[in-house]
Structures are given as C-alpha cells and as structure tokens.
C-alpha cells in the first residue's frame, strides 16, 4: 500500500530535497573553487569558471567515472593550471578521469596513462614518457624528417 501524502507534506519533502541538493551543490562548488559564485548565474561567469562549473555539476551526481572532453579548450594558462588542480583532486577522491584533450602540457603533466589515436586508430599506449618517445606518435603528431615543408 502506498501512503497518501497531502500538499503540506509534499511541500516539506520538496523543501528537504532542495536543502540536500543545495548542500551538495555548494560542496562541489567549493571543491572546484567557485563557492564565492554560488548565487551567480552560470552564464555570467568567466569562461574558465564556466568549465569548472560544468565539472562541479557532474561531480554532484557522485560519479565513479567522469569524462572530460577538451576541458582546457579556450582556456588561458592560469585557467588551465586551475583545471589541472581540480582534475588531480578528482582523482584523489577515487574517481576515474577519462580525459580527451589536445593540450599536451596538461596531458603530459596530469595523466598517468595515455592512449593515442590517429584518425580513430590506436597508435600508442603507455606512460607520458613512453608515448613521447614512440616513433608512431612522433610521425603522426610531430612529422618526420622525410615530410615536405609547407
């Protein structure tokens, strides 16, 4: 039998849900360094802060895995540094991070293991140090001595 809830009880339930959601949201905003903006609309934030807000939203669902697709795209150096600290802190919470990124400085500094694709085909896998020395990666992304100069 399902209990019947009157309008007043439903309001109380909704109020408690909202308090819990606000507590979770503020916790995640603090985690990414945006707690001072908790009353602001997301669209009014600077670009790098908007990206961190997106990460905070994802973290509010208590994920086991978070996929970050080009999170540093369009960020300046300071915003990228802030992002690297957040990614490292996410990993320290025991959350797996799948990072899809073209900012090689970020990738080489933050990742433990790399998988490199060229046109959807796996060409290398390993630590950043191993991948940097891989001939297939050098050929695909840095060019070879045999390539013509444009």
Could you tell me what each predicted segment is?
Residues 1-150:
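Glycine-rich phosphate-binding loops of nucleotide-dependent enzymes
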């Amino acid at each position: 039998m399902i209990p019947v809830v009157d309008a007043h009880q439903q309001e109380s339930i909704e109020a408690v849900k909202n308090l819990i959601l606000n507590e979770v949201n503020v916790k995640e905003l603090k985690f990414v360094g945006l707690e001072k903006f908790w009353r602001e609309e997301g669209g009014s934030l600077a670009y790098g802060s908007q990206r961190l807000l997106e990460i905070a939203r994802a973290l509010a669902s208590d994920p086991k895995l978070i996929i970050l697709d080009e999170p540093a795209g369009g960020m300046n150096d300071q915003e990228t540094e802030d992002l690297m600290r957040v990614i490292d802190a996410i990993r320290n919470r025991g959350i797996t991070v799948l990072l899809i990124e073209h900012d090689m400085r970020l990738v080489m500094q933050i990742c433990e293991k790399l998988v490199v694709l060229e046109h959807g085909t796996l060409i290398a896998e390993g630590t950043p140090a191993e991948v940097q020395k891989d001939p297939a990666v050098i050929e695909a992304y840095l060019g070879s001595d045999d390539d013509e100069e444009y």
